[in-house]
Regions:
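A generic N-terminal leader/anchor concept
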Residues: 1-6, 22-26
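Short, basic, low-complexity termini and linkers enriched in Ser/Thr/Gly/Pro
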Residues: 2, 9-19
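Subset of outer-membrane beta-barrel
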Residues: 23-327
């Protein structure tokens, strides 16, 4: 009887996870490593390669906090300054764990993107495709089952996933640029159910749209507003905010800048982010406070994130006030 009850409870938990957690990972610092947001951003940088990693710890007040980690790598395969076009390749991996069952996912995707400059190159269009494999699963080591007949259809599920994206960059003047992009992931909506009780446990299509701009003022300062929206199944998230950046030294040999900003997740959380850009490195930290109905349960403790990005530059040319992301 105890085994049967345990089985029912565990099946219920898994059914809940299948429905509620059939979502992709997301970060408050969602554009620190933009490859996680849109495959078209692969190669969208003024360097030959870029590497990044982000770690998120959420709900530290509970016994088993939610943890998410991601890493990315991108490289320019070919670039033509004459035709202002080229190909880029990228790879991203992620892992997250949640709850006492350590229910989580691991995903790895390969990306290829193509960009084309328009006119004098102040406008750039990029498209990207991605394909990969994911695995979701849980750990039953902490569950005691006295009835050997109790079992689950599978504790781990491996599935393929496909995605595509498009991005546009526009340099309006020497002091102003904007970039926008949209992507669709899980186009194939793979089945990730563990039990027969899950009526609809597909990883739903994930739509993202994103915009970022920078306006340079007072020579050494920049204002960077940002907005992002994503929808997956019944889950919606609207993020908006702005950073202020101080460019201390823009010589590549001594490059140094500091930034700070506020990010809001509509009706959910507010976050403060800090970053240091030094030579080819970017170090970032973000802390958010829970403002949703879960604030009481979490003691308003939201999450913190840390991230690092490293770029390999092709030469030591002086960076322009507003950098073209590719040339």
């Amino acid at each position: 009887m105890l085994a049967t009850c345990a089985s029912i409870i565990l099946n219920f938990q898994l059914s809940t996870f299948n429905c509620a957690q059939a979502q992709d990972i997301h970060f408050s610092m969602f554009d620190l490593d933009p490859l996680l947001f849109n495959p078209a951003y692969s190669g969208f940088f003024d360097a030959t390669a870029r590497f990044g990693a982000v770690y998120r710890n959420q709900w530290a007040s509970v016994s088993t906090p939610f943890q998410t980690f991601s890493a990315t790598a991108e490289v320019a395969l070919s670039r033509s300054n004459v035709h202002r076009n080229g190909f880029n390749a990228g790879l991203w991996v992620s892992n997250d764990r949640a709850g006492t069952l350590a229910y989580g996912s691991t995903t790895a995707s390969a990306i290829v993107s193509y960009f084309q400059g328009l006119g004098d190159g102040s406008n750039i269009i990029s498209v990207g495709l991605e394909g990969g494999l994911g695995q979701v699963g849980f750990n039953t080591d902490g569950i005691e089952m006295t009835d050997g007949t109790e079992s689950f259809r599978r504790t781990k599920v491996v599935y393929p996933t496909l995605g595509a994206g498009i991005a546009w960059y526009c340099q309006l003047s020497d002091a102003l640029y904007t970039k926008v992009g949209a992507s669709l992931r899980n186009i194939n909506e793979p089945d990730i159910s563990h039990t027969d009780m899950a009526a609809d446990a597909r990883l739903s299509r994930h739509f993202n749209i994103y915009g970022r701009a920078e306006w340079r003022f007072l020579s050494d300062w920049g204002l960077l507003p940002v907005v992002g929206y994503q929808r997956q199944r019944n889950f919606n998230e609207l993020v908006y905010g702005a950073d202020v950046r101080w460019y201390v030294d823009e010589d590549p040999r001594r490059y140094l800048a500091f930034s700070a900003g506020i990010i809001g997740r509509h009706a959910d959380a507010a976050a403060i982010d800090l970053a240091v850009l030094w030579r080819s490195w970017t170090f970032a930290f973000c802390y958010d406070v829970n403002l949703s109905r879960l604030a009481t349960a979490s003691n308003t403790i939201g999450s913190f994130e840390v991230g690092v990005v490293y770029m390999i530059h092709k030469d030591n040319r002086r960076r322009r006030a507003i950098q073209c992301p590719i040339f």
